[in-house]
Each structure stands twice: as structure tokens, then as C-alpha cells.
A protein has these predicted regions:
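Bacterial N-terminal signal peptides
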Residues: 11-20
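Active-site beta-loop-alpha junctions enriched in small/polar residues
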Residues: 65, 100, 144-146, 192-194
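Bacterial N-terminal signal peptides that target proteins for export
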Residues: 2-10
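Acidic, His- and aromatic-enriched active-site or binding-groove loops in soluble protein domains
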Residues: 161-176, 180
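C-terminal active-site rim and adjoining tail of enzyme catalytic domains
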Residues: 190-218
Length: 218
């Protein structure tokens, strides 16, 4: 991942529309259990297919969801009406994933509330499966340590992001001139914590809440 290079400050100009609503999902897996909510939103699983390959990623308005996996915790913590697979089919392409060590895995959390889904078992496989089915699409995935020790988060995240079976689905090096063609069928990660060296995507270390992410390339 390029964190040093050009002496340029690049504002990541991805316009992300954050969608908030009550949630539905099962207690253990990301399954579709809320038919009414799904029916209310038109399915757009391949909307990026009609966009030109030469479009810079930073020039595309990309719909996203805030605390994308937040399915529990009461009215103060729930943020979504549909689970992540349903969001993917509805056209969401930017995801805000908050993780914390839970046992020997990374659980999805919103504040203190565990969402009964795991990064390794549920979320990342859902992303990969979607891209296998719809290779015209690209996903922007923000990863943040929601709690716990940084070393635990870093160790577990490194294992999943270093898995050989997933490497072809990751944008390995961020650069300002990335085009849609560069990213089709792949995930562009935005890392909000310096968890490890040489991880895929872009470093947004120091990205505070309610602020803009600035990527500094020297």
C-alpha cells in the first residue's frame, strides 16, 4: 500500500450517501430475513456495469451505508434496515465495517454492541461471493477497530487480508489515478487504523469521526 510518495495531499473524493434505518438479520449469519424491507428497495446488483472503464474512482458518486453491519443494540445503535448481502443487491457499494476481537475472530460491533456476525465468516465471504457473481462491480470498504487492543485487531485482520485465496479480489495499492477498470471485481479498503504493514488498500490513519479522510502521499 502506498503511504509515502508524492508530497501530495489527496482528498479522497468518493461521495458516499449514508443510509440509516432499522435492521433485520438472523442471530448468527447474514441471511435475508426481512422481505418487506427488501421489497421496498429496487435491486441494482450491476449498476456499475454501464459506467465507462476509464472513469476515475474518485469521480464516481458511490452510495454507502453507515455502520453497515449494525443489526442490534436498540434504537440508539441500529443503523440498517437490511443486512449486508441485501445492501449489495440494492446497489450499496461503500461499507463502514467496525471490528473488535471476539474469541479468536473479529466480530462486527457498533460501540459495545456485538452484532452476532464475524468478519472472517460472514462479511468478507459475502463481499467476495458478490464480486464473483457480479465482476463489473467494485466495493469500497472502510475498516475500523471499534474496541479492544490494536495488536489483537492487527493480528486477526492480517490473517484474513493475507489469505492467498482472496488476493485477486483486493486493490493492493491505492493511487489517485485509479480507474473503475482497475477496481472492477475488487475491494478497495480504507484503513482507519495502522494495523499492519503492506496491507491492501489506502491508509486513512487519524481519520476522526465526523471528518473528511485525507490521504497523504509523499
Amino acid at each position: 500500500m502506498k503511504r509515502n510518495g508524492l508530497r501530495t495531499v489527496v482528498v479522497l473524493a468518493l461521495t458516499i450517501f449514508l443510509l440509516n434505518a432499522p435492521v433485520c438479520a438472523t442471530a448468527s449469519r447474514l441471511q435475508d430475513t426481512c422481505a418487506e424491507a427488501r421489497d421496498e428497495v429496487a435491486l441494482r446488483p450491476e449498476w456499475m456495469r454501464i459506467l465507462h472503464d476509464t472513469l476515475p474512482i474518485c469521480k464516481i458518486s458511490i452510495p454507502g451505508s453507515h455502520d453497515s453491519g449494525s443489526i442490534k443494540g436498540g434504537h440508539m445503535l441500529k443503523t440498517q434496515a437490511t443486512d449486508i448481502p441485501a445492501q449489495l443487491r440494492q446497489g450499496i457499494r461503500a461499507f463502514d465495517i467496525r471490528l473488535e476481537k471476539k474469541g479468536n475472530k473479529l466480530g462486527v460491533f457498533h460501540s459495545h454492541a456485538f452484532q452476532d456476525i464475524y468478519w472472517e465468516d460472514d462479511v468478507l465471504p459475502a463481499f467476495i461471493h458478490f464480486l464473483q457473481t457480479y465482476p463489473s462491480e467494485t466495493l469500497i470498504v472502510s475498516l475500523k477497530k471499534e474496541g479492544g487492543e490494536l495488536r489483537d485487531y492487527a493480528s486477526l485482520l492480517s490473517v484474513s487480508l493475507s489469505s492467498p485465496e482472496y488476493q485477486s479480489y483486493f486493490v493492493m495499492d491505492f493511487r489517485p489515478e485509479l480507474t473503475l477498470k482497475d477496481c472492477r471485481g475488487k475491494i478497495l479498503f480504507l484503513h482507519r487504523d495502522h494495523a499492519m504493514d503492506n496491507y491492501p488498500g489506502a491508509a486513512c490513519v487519524g481519520w476522526e469521526d465526523d471528518s473528511t479522510c485525507l490521504l497523504t502521499l509523499r
